[in-house]
Amino acid sequence: MERLKNHREFVAVLKRRRRVSDADIVLHYVVRTPSTPTGAAPARRLGLAVSKSVGNAVVRNTVKRRFRVLAHRYEHELPADCDIVLRAKPGAAHASFQSLEAQIQALFRAVMRKSEQS
């Protein structure tokens, strides 16, 4: 899974206002039209937003590491050309790894379901 690298890419996802949320995570997403050349694999891209309300730098980095691991683990459950931004709510700092895993898996499935409907 590639990364969203600059502010413009984050804003493009956040402006679409398509989101799903759970107790500790809000997932903003946009399914892109396939613009990759033939033969190139479609890319899913991930951005992370963990604000200071989650905790100090150590806590924020721990949350980001967990999000990255879980996003890579369940990326196959997302549409092929999809950009997502995972935004942590303050409760994510105290959530167990298993709880975050269940939430991310459910959110990714919800994105897949919603993208197939539209």
Curated annotation (Swiss-Prot):
UniProt xrefs under InterPro entries: Ribosomal_Su5_D2-typ_SF, Ribsml_uS5_D2-typ_fold_subgr, RNase_P
Cystine crosslinks: none
Domain of life of the organism encoding this protein: Bacteria
EC number in record: 3.1.26.5
Keywords of this entry: Endonuclease, Hydrolase, Nuclease, RNA-binding, tRNA processing
Catalytic activity: Endonucleolytic cleavage of RNA, removing 5'-extranucleotides from tRNA precursor
A single Gene Ontology CC term: ribonuclease P complex
GO function term, MF aspect, one: ribonuclease P activity
Pfam families, sorted: Ribonuclease_P (PF00825)
SUPFAM superfamilies: Ribosomal protein S5 domain 2-like
A biological-process GO annotation: tRNA 5'-leader removal
Quaternary structure note: Consists of a catalytic RNA component (M1 or rnpB) and a protein subunit.
Function field: RNaseP catalyzes the removal of the 5'-leader sequence from pre-tRNA to produce the mature 5'-terminus. It can also cleave other RNA substrates such as 4.5S RNA. The protein component plays an auxiliary but essential role in vivo by binding to the 5'-leader sequence and broadening the substrate specificity of the ribozyme.
Family: Belongs to the RnpA family.
UniProt cross-references to PANTHER family, sorted A to Z: RIBONUCLEASE P PROTEIN COMPONENT
Name of the molecule in the record: Ribonuclease P protein component
Species: Bifidobacterium animalis subsp. lactis (strain AD011)
Phylogenetic classification of the source organism: Bacteria, Bacillati, Actinomycetota, Actinomycetes, Bifidobacteriales
